[in-house]
Each structure stands twice: as structure tokens, then as C-alpha cells.
């Protein structure tokens, strides 16, 4: 008795097609590249700059120069992995109310010879339904 190979061939083709999909779509919770202009990335970056300035012992504010790279991961919410360049400003940290992100971004830069640039890696955990963001990791050099 001769059997048709058609029923076996269709599932095999489907399996091959699935194997050709990009790996990020097949790994739940895996890192995915994000556009640095994405509004969620911009929000996480602004939060990172504010937190950096709140936690650092620097006498002057540092502002965002640019977002070099952004990735995200779906967790209970979203985790953003950001590589950013920050630049020291002329705005001294006062003992009064700390500046917010938009105010920091308006701070002037010192003359070229006195500029200090940092490359920072931030991890930000966002849970929009709780209206909460948390800086889970930060390293700058």
C-alpha cells in the first residue's frame, strides 16, 4: 500500500518557516532593540537622567546628550536597557528644590575645554498600570 507524503510535508514546511523567524520573536522575555526616538524610551531616558542627578554626588547637573542604544524586555511591565551620553552642565545643584528633566536639559554647557562627558548604562523598570518607574541599575564612566 502506497501512502501520500502530503500530510507529513505540510507540517514540516511550517516548522521550517518558524525556524526562520527572527529569534527575538521566539524568545518570550528576550531583549528587543528599540528606536531611540520611541516615546517610551524617551520617558525612560528622562527618568534615568533625573535619577542619576538625584543619586550622584556631583556638584553640577548632568544632562542628556544623546541616547546611544535602547533595548527593552517584557517582564512584569517593561525593562529598558539604555546606553546614554551625559554632559556636565553649568547648573549647580542647589539645596532647594531639585531641577526636573526639562529644566536640566535647558542648562548651558561649559566651554569645550571644561566639558565632561559620561557614558552611562541604565536599566529602568516601568510598570505603567502602577504609574511607577524604578532605576534598577546604573553605571557611568
UniProtKB/Swiss-Prot annotation:
Record's signal peptide:
1-26
Where does the Cystatin domain start and stop, copy by copy? 29-129
Q: Which cysteines are joined by disulfide bonds?
A: 91-107, 120-140
The tissues where this chain's protein is expressed are given as: Expressed at a low level by the venom gland (at protein level).
Give me the Gene Ontology terms describing cellular component.
Answer: extracellular exosome
Compartments it resides in: Secreted
Q: Which UniProt keywords apply?
A: Disulfide bond, Protease inhibitor, Secreted, Signal, Thiol protease inhibitor
Short name of one Pfam family for this protein? Answer: Cystatin
Which residue numbers does the motif Secondary area of contact cover?
A: 73-77
User: Which SMART domains does the UniProt entry name for this protein?
Assistant: CY
The record's principal subcellular location, in a coarse class, is secreted
Q: Molecular function (GO) terms listed?
A: cysteine-type endopeptidase inhibitor activity
InterPro entries the UniProt entry points to: Cystatin_dom, Cystatin_sf, Prot_inh_cystat_CS
Q: Residues at site: Reactive site?
A: 29
Source taxon at top rank: Eukaryota
* Similarity comment: family membership: Belongs to the cystatin family.
Instruction: Give the protein's function.
Output: Inhibits various C1 cysteine proteases including cathepsin L, papain and cathepsin B. This protein has no toxic activity and its function in the venom is unknown. It may play a role as a housekeeping or regulatory protein.
Q: Which PANTHER family match?
A: CYSTATIN-M
Q: What else is known?
A: Negative results: the recombinant protein does not inhibit calpain-1 (CAPN1), a C2 family cysteine protease and legumain (LGMN), a C13 family cysteine protease. Does not provoke cell death (PC3 prostate cancer cells).
Q: What is this protein called?
A: Cystatin
